[in-house]
Regions:
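Histone-fold recognition with a strong bias for associated Lys/Arg-rich disordered tails
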Residues: 1-190
Length: 190
């Protein structure tokens, strides 16, 4: 049903939510805990995602924005939100329908993207990660190229091209076109 590592990730999620005395486990708690899961780490590395920045942003969000979930009574168990439950169910159903036996955290990462209105998806998109990137890696092993490197290359090409154009313009400013100086109606000597 679910892998041992995913089970450990879910336990970490519960502990993380409890550490803030939250009554519910949200997708943001789950995503934060998944950043320590080996299956998710492989995906994020392949997609060139800054895991530390993502983790820091999630932790900051949980601290500041989920204060309404605080329950001072320590005897209450932390419960998953409906969105949390849907994501886990979606991942398990998808894995079963594809003929595999166990869902792992990478499958859960794909399922998180179905909860479009969640802050977890927002933070993933802030890091320029989308569902297609994750699915491409999991299904075909296609790693996302570092778009920053591509951008730098395009910028360098543009800069070099502009330098060449400016150089040509400067040459035109200081030189004289002798073809324009010669009269056009004169015959060429034989």
């Amino acid at each position: 049903m679910i892998s041992d590592e995913l089970e450990k990730t879910l336990q970490r999620t519960q502990k993380f939510a409890k550490s803030f005395k939250h009554q519910y486990m949200t997708l943001e708690h789950l995503l934060f805990s998944m950043l320590d899961d080996n299956d998710v780490i492989k995906v994020l590395d392949a997609c060139v995602i800054d895991k530390d920045k993502l983790k820091k942003n999630l932790e900051k969000f949980v601290e500041r924005n989920l204060r309404d979930l605080v329950n001072e009574s320590s005897e209450n168990e932390v419960k998953p939100t409906l969105g949390f439950q849907r994501v886990i169910q979606r991942a398990v159903i998808h894995v079963q329908s594809s003929g595999k036996e166990e869902a792992n955290a990478a499958n859960v990462l794909v399922a998180i993207f179905s909860e479009r209105e969640s802050h977890a998806v927002y933070f993933l998109q802030q890091e320029n990660l989308n569902r297609l990137d994750v699915v491409n890696y999991l299904s075909h092993g296609i790693e996302k190229e570092n778009e920053r490197d591509d951008f730098d290359q395009v910028l360098n090409d543009y800069t070099e091209n502009n330098k060449q154009k400016k150089s040509n313009q400067n040459i035109k400013k200081i030189s004289v076109d002798l073809n324009k100086k010669t009269p056009t109606n004169k015959k060429k000597p034989n």
